[in-house]
From Swiss-Prot:
GO terms for biological process: AMP catabolic process; pyrimidine deoxyribonucleoside metabolic process; pyrimidine nucleobase metabolic process. Belongs to the thymidine/pyrimidine-nucleoside phosphorylase family. Type 2 subfamily. It catalyses: AMP + phosphate = alpha-D-ribose 1,5-bisphosphate + adenine; CMP + phosphate = cytosine + alpha-D-ribose 1,5-bisphosphate; UMP + phosphate = alpha-D-ribose 1,5-bisphosphate + uracil. SUPFAM superfamilies: Nucleoside phosphorylase/phosphoribosyltransferase catalytic domain (SSF52418), Nucleoside phosphorylase/phosphoribosyltransferase N-terminal domain (SSF47648), Pyrimidine nucleoside phosphorylase C-terminal domain (SSF54680). Keywords: Glycosyltransferase, Transferase. The keyword Lipid metabolism does not apply. HAMAP family: AMP_phosphorylase. Its EC number is 2.4.2.57. It comes from Methanocella arvoryzae (strain DSM 22066 / NBRC 105507 / MRE50). This is AMP phosphorylase. It is an enzyme of class 2 (transferase). Catalyzes the conversion of AMP and phosphate to adenine and ribose 1,5-bisphosphate (R15P). Exhibits phosphorylase activity toward CMP and UMP in addition to AMP. Functions in an archaeal AMP degradation pathway, together with R15P isomerase and RubisCO.
């Protein structure tokens, strides 16, 4: 069938076209089927149908397909029915509880990266992986496929270190301290981090307050080789590109299949050339891993996958039932991290976790004797070497190396919530705390953050400040404070949670 091309400057994430329902019927295709669009070049695209947007005799072509085929408006193209990718049948195989082969897994991941699958097909794969879990072979094959379908970095010097946290704990700013400590010891650490999806700020969001974080894979290698480390946003690279597309499906479904968690983390680390890693697994109420028992099992799974990939993995089960440190979100978190590097001061939870994990990495990297890593980490901070290295990393990433903790901007709209009575703080809700921060504008508004004046187990008097919230916009601050009063993030003993009266 001959149709006239009509461009649409809309990104849809794949090759996609839209044709009139009458033309679709004549072609024998339905919405979700594929067609070949032929001009000087040929592409295969997913079909959408319409009764109104595109008139008969025309074909609407979205940006990705338009840029690939390079036709001009109203140019006549040939449109023919095309078969679905073979990977669709492999997805159906997983839905039927069958084990996939290495080749089948690679085909699925390749089609995800190339945009050859519809949202329905990708969702089917993610859901099937969640319901019918993958075995160790499938997880390894998925990891390798995610690496092969994106950019990879290799270094001439080894070991190449990395650190990753499963997440779920507000205030987990330790990457900003760990990366310069490890690099100051002479080890390489090309740290790629994520932005917050449901949290108040990921490591990349925090680092972006100090310097740019969006770099290509070759730039990451160059910066790491020059100063020993970097802390960048993984989403700006083409490293394991299938991961972001899978996450986009998982998020609205509120699922995180273990197989894809393992593959996602390990593919990104393997692709940047890391061969030695410490994995932080926070456990506790309102974290991703509620119990230590579940944490141990996840640790074993990661270590087994590391063995299969030739990576040395050690895991740290950490307490995640309460925020790390006293600063959560944006500039206040960055300030707290920098104060630790500047003065070796700060909340005990931040100091202890940073030093413990850094010590593990220094021992694994071979620069500290067994059981001496933590001592070396402390010396690197107290001597100023870690701070100097952090400034070098900031500079190589395009930031101001003269920045100090008191120069980091925070929101100028401020409110403090007071305790309604005397008593001990019994609980801090991680989820409510994060929700309040997001209502205040985090992670988009970099000035948003919370300072906790009291933590779990501490005594508070009536009228004392429980926490202070900073924001960039007054109306967002008001919305967040109102929410915190309706659903308190802190429970002080003796507080009435809800009053129920006779009507």
């Amino acid at each position: 069938m001959k149709l006239r091309a009509q461009p649409y400057d809309i990104e849809v994430g794949r090759y996609e076209v839209i044709i009139n329902s009458a033309d679709a019927e004549e072609l024998g295709v339905l919405a979700g089927d594929r067609v070949q669009v032929k001009d000087k070049d040929t592409i295969t695209a997913v079909v959408e149908t319409t009764d109104a947007i595109v008139s008969p005799g025309k074909i609407g072509i979205y940006r990705e397909a338009w840029e690939s085929i390079k036709v001009v408006p109203d140019e006549v193209v040939e449109v023919l029915p095309a078969a679905k990718p073979k990977s669709v049948s492999f997805i159906r195989k997983k839905m039927d509880k069958q084990k996939l082969t290495s080749e089948e897994m690679h085909a699925i991941i390749e089609d995800i990266v190339d945009g050859n699958l519809t949202e329905v097909e990708l969702t089917a794969f993610v859901t099937a992986s969640y319901i019918y879990t993958m075995d160790s072979d499938e997880i390894e094959w998925m990891t390798r496929a995610m690496v092969k379908t994106g950019d990879q970095i290799s270094f001439d010097v080894h070991p190449v270190m990395d650190h990753h946290s499963i997440g779920g704990v507000p205030g987990n700013k330790i990457s900003l301290c760990i990366v310069p400590i490890i690099a100051a010891a002479g080890l390489l650490i090309p740290k790629t981090s994520s932005r917050a999806i449901t949290g108040a700020g990921g490591s990349a969001d925090l680092m972006e307050i100090l310097c740019p974080v969006s770099f290509r894979a070759d730039e990451i290698k160059k910066m790491t080789t020059k100063v020993g480390g970097c802390l960048v946003w993984g989403g700006a690279t083409n490293i394991a590109p299938a991961d972001d597309k899978i996450i986009n499906v998982e998020y609205p479904l509120s699922i995180d299949p273990k197989s894809q968690l393992l593959a996602s983390v390990m593919a990104k680390k393997f692709a940047v050339g890391a061969d030695t890693m410490v994995l932080d697994i926070p456990c506790g109420n309102e974290t991703k891993i509620p119990t230590v028992q579940e944490g141990r099992k996840l640790a074993r799974d990661f270590m087994e996958l590391g063995d299969r990939l030739g990576m040395k993995i050690e895991c740290a089960l950490t307490y995640g039932g309460t925020p790390l440190g006293r600063a959560i979100g944006g500039g206040v978190e960055v300030r707290e991290a920098m104060v630790m590097l500047e003065k070796f001061e700060g909340p005990r939870s931040l100091l202890e976790k940073t030093i413990a994990i850094s010590g593990m990495m220094l021992e694994m990297g071979g620069v500290a004797p067994k059981n001496e890593g933590a001592k070396m980490a402390v010396e690197l901070v107290k001597s100023g070497k870690a701070l100097q290295k952090f400034k070098e990393i900031i500079e190589v990433q395009g930031g101001d190396p003269k920045v100090t903790s008191d120069m980091v901007p925070i929101g100028d709209k401020v409110a403090t919530v007071l305790s309604p009575q005397d008593g001990y703080v019994l609980e801090i809700s991680n989820k409510r705390l994060v929700y309040m921060c997001r209502l205040a504008g985090a992670p988009h508004d970099k000035g948003v953050g919370v300072i906790l004046h009291k933590k779990k187990g501490e005594y508070v008097k009536k009228g004392d400040g429980l926490f202070t919230l900073y924001a960039d916009k007054e109306w967002k601050l008001d919305a967040a404070i109102k929410e915190s009063l309706r659903n308190p993030i802190m429970m002080v003993e003796g507080m009435i949670l809800e009053k129920i009266e006779v009507v």
